[in-house]
Amino acid sequence: MMNPHVQENLQAIHNALSNFDTSFLSEDEEDYCPLCIEPMDITDKNFFPCPCGYQICQFCYNNIRQNPELNGRCPACRRKYDDENVRYVTLSPEELKMERAKLARKEKERKHREKERKENEYTNRKHLSGTRVIQKNLVYVVGINPPVPYEEVAPTLKSEKYFGQYGKINKIVVNRKTPHSNNTTSEHYHHHSPGYGVYITFGSKDDAARCIAQVDGTYMDGRLIKAAYGTTKYCSSYLRGLPCPNPNCMFLHEPGEEADSFNKRELHNKQQAQQQSGGTAFTRSGIHNNISTSTAGSNTNLLSENFTGTPSPAAMRAQLHHDSHTNAGTPVLTPAPVPAGSNPWGVTQSATPVTSINLSKNSSSINLPTLNDSLGHHTTPTTENTITSTTTTTNTNATSHSHGSKKKQSLAAEEYKDPYDALGNAVDFLDARLHSLSNYQKRPISIKSNIIDEETYKKYPSLFSWDKIEASKKSDNTLANKLVEILAIKPIDYTASVVQFLQSVNVGVNDNITITDNTKTPTQPIRLQTVSQQIQPPLNVSTPPPGIFGPQHKVPIQQQQMGDTSSRNSSDLLNQLINGRKIIAGN
């Protein structure tokens, strides 16, 4: 009989599950053992070791019964397992057949889903078949040509004299450009051949970066050496989602960084942009068998072979040394001029001190062939039989003419300035001022002493002192002339303002009288008396206190003065100022 406590728990679980929508649960879902998380077969699904209904696989049941640490109890209800309580459900042949068909259908669906997943992965990776990825531990070097046969090139380059000094090398692949014969003309081929294209796979990225930093842009035996990161592609087995059978496969088997990846279309666009910006690139394929002395002299202006599609600076270096190669000694590296462009590969200088470093790369160094393109393609290019001096001279003149026309066009483009470009004009102005101030030169400045005489100089007022100014004892009568001018034009309208102005001047005059010297001429008291008589108001007008002669008091005073004596007072004042005496009018 089932434990009442367990029965209540099962009933509560059943009631709780009845409140949830279980339609999304599939009957085809595979059952797993709750203990070992392994799929349960048909016999396990029909095996009930405990009356509570908690099912486990037969392996876990035997483990619980035989392991003394597990106490032989049910994980759900903690009831002691007993063989008498074990219940088996026997399936009929029809039920067994249906169960097996169900399992077969599940397995088929599982395989179908796995196939779809692989197809989706292949579809997602299909576009990677034409993608090239920069491999940071792979270095591609062009222009190197050691004086050894082709069979010994790889071991020689792997030695400590060459690239072995930069770190551990896992693999070297040499792309043969020109053949090396064993006859007496081998030195001639070595001297004029363009060199090999070598792929060097280092053990670490730092070793590859150090190799590029020290080798790129140097000259070895008069030949320009270029080094850059090599590019590779994805393994075909990786693209199909299959394991790669080649343990030494050098292709990628994992997704690369997007910043280091580019496809053929992007590469073509970069080449077009570089050709438009950098002009026409001149390349030369093959080698020369018969070159005379005059032809070799005229060929100094020609460009050497450049795998990157851009002109090489080797043509401008006339002082390159061409040592004899009778012995296979260590090559001499000569620093090259810094080529134009930036560092597209992002090479960072390591802490290890290096010599003859040139981190600048040509912007078209991404055009280097890939490792896949060079494997199995060791073809021998055709050679040129004879180059005459006439052809060389014609090519040289055409090259110089094209460069001259491009230079004129560039100068014309630089000379034109937009007059409406405010920012450009401001920058030019600042540049001009900075240039003038940076190149400022001291210029001595002297003033001639005979420009003015001493008498004129003394008459000039001092800038900081008034000691040299002489006080004038004679008045210019400027105030009187101003009053005459005002009264002659409109004597009635300006009477009040003139009286107010004279009263304000009277205060300053009285102050000046106390300061000036006591020895005055007889004319000065008469003149002061005359001015005081002029500013006396009429008898019938009360003198207002000082400070009330504002604009608001002008109208009442003017109305009092505009009686029958207004015109007579104006005439008296005018005659007094003109004749210098006072005329008293009768009442």
Curated annotation (Swiss-Prot):
It is found in: Cytoplasm; Nucleus. One of its GO terms (molecular function) is zinc ion binding. GO terms for biological process: deadenylation-independent decapping of nuclear-transcribed mRNA; nuclear-transcribed mRNA catabolic process, no-go decay; nuclear-transcribed mRNA poly(A) tail shortening; positive regulation of transcription elongation by RNA polymerase II; proteasomal protein catabolic process; protein monoubiquitination; protein polyubiquitination; protein ubiquitination. CDD domains: mRING-HC-C4C4_CNOT4, RRM_CNOT4. Pfam families: zf-RING_4. Forms a NOT protein complex that comprises NOT1, NOT2, NOT3, NOT4 and NOT5. Subunit of the 1.0 MDa CCR4-NOT core complex that contains CCR4, CAF1, NOT1, NOT2, NOT3, NOT4, NOT5, CAF40 and CAF130. In the complex interacts with NOT1. The core complex probably is part of a less characterized 1.9 MDa CCR4-NOT complex. Keywords: Activator, Coiled coil, Cytoplasm, Isopeptide bond, Metal-binding, Nucleus, Phosphoprotein, Repressor, RNA-binding, Transcription, Transcription regulation, Transferase, Ubl conjugation, Ubl conjugation pathway, Zinc, Zinc-finger. The lineage of its organism: Eukaryota, Fungi, Dikarya, Ascomycota, Saccharomycotina. Residues 94-128 form a coiled coil. There is a cross-link at K270 (Glycyl lysine isopeptide (Lys-Gly) (interchain with G-Cter in ubiquitin)). E3 ubiquitin-protein ligase component of the CCR4-NOT core complex, which in the nucleus seems to be a general transcription factor, and in the cytoplasm the major mRNA deadenylase involved in mRNA turnover. The NOT protein subcomplex negatively regulates the basal and activated transcription of many genes. Preferentially affects TC-type TATA element-dependent transcription. Could directly or indirectly inhibit component(s) of the general transcription machinery. The modification Phosphoserine is found at S312, S360. Residues 377-402 have a biased composition (Low complexity). Its EC number is 2.3.2.27. It comes from Saccharomyces cerevisiae (strain ATCC 204508 / S288c) (Baker's yeast). Residues 137-228 form the RRM domain. It is an enzyme of class 2 (transferase). One of its GO terms (cellular component) is cytosolic ribosome. This is General negative regulator of transcription subunit 4. Present with 4280 molecules/cell in log phase SD medium. SMART domains: RRM_1. Pathway: Protein modification; protein ubiquitination. It comes from the Eukaryota. A zinc finger (C3H1-type) spans 229-256. It catalyses: S-ubiquitinyl-[E2 ubiquitin-conjugating enzyme]-L-cysteine + [acceptor protein]-L-lysine = [E2 ubiquitin-conjugating enzyme]-L-cysteine + N(6)-ubiquitinyl-[acceptor protein]-L-lysine. The modification Phosphothreonine is found at T310, T326.
